Structures are given as C-alpha cells and as structure tokens.
Amino acid sequence: MKFSEMSYTRPDIDALLGQCKALAAKAAGAASGEELVNVYYEQSRAFADYSTAAQLASIHYTCDTRDAYWKAEQDFFDANGPAVENARVEISRAFLANAHVDALTEAFGTTCVAGMKNAVLGMDDRTVELQKEYNALVSQYQQVYGGALVEFDGKQLTIPQLGPYKENLDPAVRRAAYEAEAAYFDAHRDELDGLYTKIVKNLNAQAQILGYHDYSELSYVRMNRIGYGPAEIRKFRVQVASDVVPELKKVIELRCKRTGISHLTFSDLPVAFQDGNPSPIEGYEARMAAARTMYHELSPETAEFIDFMQDNELFDVESRPGKMSGGYMTSLPTYKAPFIFANWNNTSADVDVLTHECGHAFEGYVAERDPKVPADLECPGMESAEIHSMAMEFLTAPWHHLLFGKDTEKYALLHAEDSFLFLAYGCIVDEFQHRMYQNPDLTPDERNAVWLELEHKYRPWIDFDNLPFYGRGAGWQRQLHIYECPFYYIDYCLSTMAALQFFLLSLKDHKDAWERYLKLVRRAGLASYTELMQTAGLKVPFEDGSIKAIAQQMGQWIAEHQV
C-alpha cells in the first residue's frame, strides 16, 4: 500500500491498556514454555496498530511541524505514550516472573529476557508524569529547530538548505552561512538553554525515583545496552583519544594540504577539495533511478526491498519550510513498511543519508518478513542497528558512480575521511552528556565551557575563530540527539567501528563482506552487539588495543587515495 493511502485513526488508549492487562495475566499464567513463547508472539503483535498510528502521526508531524492537526496528534502520543510503555513493562514483569521464562531465551536468544529486565528496571508508574513532561519538552525543541528559517543569499532558507553555502569555495561565503545559522540559534539562546536545563533535571529526577544516581546510569538501561556498561564505553573513548586522534590529525593535515588551507578554522571544516566537494547528480527522479539500479545490482534481497520502498512512496527526503531537520527511518508494522525521512540539500550528504537510512530500512524490511522474529525483536539495540546503516554506506560503494559520476573518487575519499573523523565528534557528544547529567547544576556558560574543553581533547585541530554561537561553545545545541534522545550517540561510534571493518573487508573481497553483512542483518534483534560483531567476524572495540590496527589501516588507505 502506498504511504498516501495509509489511513490514520487515533487509537483507543483505554482499550489498549485493558488488552495489556489481559496479556500480562496470560504471561503470568502460561503453564509451559511453549505456551509462554506463544503468548510472547501474541503480545508482540498486539501493539502493531498502536505503533503504526504513533509512527504515522510522528511522520506527518515531522514532515510539517506547523500543521495543527498533526501537532495535536503528536501531543496525544506524547501524553499517552508513557502509560502504554508502562503497561508493556507490566507485561514484561509477568513474563519474567513465570517459571518457564528460560523458554524465551531458548526461542529468541539472549536479548529477549535481558531486554525485558532492562524495561522493568527503566520504567515505573511513578515516572509517568515526568515522562509526559519530557516528551513535551522535546516537542518544544523540535518546534524551535523545525521552525528555523534564515535570510541568506536573498532567500529564506531552512538550516539544512544552508549546507551548500557552508561548502562554498569562498571562505567569506562559508563564514557568512555559519553566521546566519548562528544568528538563529543565538536569537533562541535563552529558550534552548532553558529547555536543556529542564530536560537534565527531568531525566535525573526520573533516574532518582528508580534508584539511580543520575540519568547517565539509567540511560544504559533505557538504551537497552546488553553486555557492556559505562566502564566499557570509557575504555572505548580512551582508545579513541589515544589511538584514533593521532591518525585523525594526519588526515586533517592531508586535507589542508589538498585544499590549500594553511590555517583551519571551524567554517573551513566542510571543504575537502580545492576545486569543490563532490556533488551528486541533481533531481529526485534521477537519484531514485540510480538507487533502484544500485540496489538491484547489489543483491536479490535489496532489489526486492528498493522496489517496495519506491513503489509505495516510502521516502520523504527533500527539505522544505516547516519540516523537522535531520533524517530517520521508522517502521509501520501494520503494513510491514519502513519509511525514510531526510532533508536533502544538494551536497554529498544526500547520498550519505540515502544509503544510511536504506541500511536501517533494509534490515527492517527483512525482519518484518521473518515469521520467527517477534515484532518487538525485529530491531537490535541502537548501537547494533546503526551497523546496518553505516555499513550500507560503504557496501554500496561499487555503485556510487551512478550518483557521482566524475566525482566518485572524491566522494570515496571524503566518505572514508568523514566516517573516520566522526569517531572524535561522537566521543565529544557522549562524554559531554555524561558530564551534564553528573553535574546538573552547571550554568549554560559552564556547559559551553565543557563542550569547548572536549573539542580541544578530541578535535584539537579546530579553531573557532570567534564564530558566533559555535565560538562560545554552544554548537552542541544543534545536535538533535542531545535533546531528543540523550546518550543515543555513542551508538554511532560503536557501529562506525563495525562499518570501517566492513569497508576494509570489502576492499579485499566485496562478496564476502556482503555475505557477512547479510548474515548479521538476518539475526535481527535476536543478538547483542558483541554477538552480532562475532557473527560477522569483526573485532569488538572494548578490548585494549582493539581499535589501533583499524585506525592505522584507515589512515593508510586515506593517505594512499588522495585525489
């Protein structure tokens, strides 16, 4: 069914909550392992219509945050979602209390029971009002960001539409584009500072109700991190600082040599080539035709997937006023349909987001069609889900010429560099958030000082050159995740470690790399991050020294492929 034909009905929350009580009773009373497994399948199906309605409302709202009808529907889910989530937790509690709970591990692997334990530890009726308040704060942030329009070059532009100007070869144009963006955020400075103060206090209050010191602890439970915790993430960040940052300095030196920029300032960062960055082919239809060819030639599975996506209008990727910034993939369970949202701005990032979100959507498409996989185990934890997307960016490389033509080699180099450089930025975001929730009384200026301190630690090559907004350390406020889904960022770093390994494997044997990827995808949400890495024969980046060799190989490839 085409997206435009999908009907929306606001769900009956009371009826759903009643159904949840009945399912909890069934889970508690299951008299055998087989019966318990069947109840698990039943409860996972029970939420399909609710989830579909919630996602339809979210899609329509983020596609136009000014639409009063969809704003009201989004408000409805913001207000009622916590009660539904807590009802689901009660079902999990009933499963865990059943004497036959081990049957779920036998049927569905290690993540099922561990995930339910995290759900029980992370939610409680006592936090419902705080959860509602948090959802409302996120919606306020989305309105501030989604409503951003700046006057530039004689036009009214959204934040994503400033992208091409930030890559302009004239440094004055680049800086002016950043200043135009900065002016918008500075105009909303008090609002953004106030929202973040409220978010930190809200989430810390939820954590303390549940017995945690602060939200940085609770986040590991809420993010359903299985098999690792804060100690492993600290080890990872230490390795990035000691083993990756020195290689990244060399990458930056090569880029400066290539571009002829002797002193790198923040507004110079987007420029990767003296004659301009790689540009993808223009036009929605041309790009979609190239994507169809690419995925048809990659594999039979991806051919079926891209036909389904395009034939059913499951892309909204062009930027326009009122549309929320960023990109995402979500699923509409009733229709077994992934949906891709993005903001193209005629830069190479358009191809990044296309292949990235198609990686997510491909995994969702495959999992939704596997009858053995319950709906709530179709997707693994976020650090694992991002492997699907980030690895897909690299595994489609043999077809990038369809999207870049003469700029293909430039894009290959830029993409490898940016993926590698991202590890430093991702660690800044993660360490910053740990510091914020562990020190909730910091003033806005003190928060910004922490951000600048971490920039110097992980990206010492950057000079902010007195740039408004960014120069005072407030650049983190345009990073959606910090407000919308705290601590969902180190996931990108962990998955980048997998994606870089897939890239290096594909250079030796693309067929082997793709088969490993497909094997990983087919495990859906039935395995943890470490198990999925092992499934594909990849190194897990928590062990001391596990990152160094990968960093050196990436540095070497980049040095050998200067354009």
Predicted regions: what they are:
Residues Y196-H213, V251-R255, G359-R369, M390-D407:
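Long, well-ordered alpha-helical segments
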Residues S242-D243, A367-E368, C379-D407, A416, ...:
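Post-HExxH zinc-binding segment in Zn-dependent metallohydrolases
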Residues G122-M123, E181-H188, Y228-R234, L269-P280, ...:
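Glycine- and acidic
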Residues T110, G115-K117, G227, E318, ...:
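C-terminal, non-catalytic "cap/extension" segments appended to globular domains
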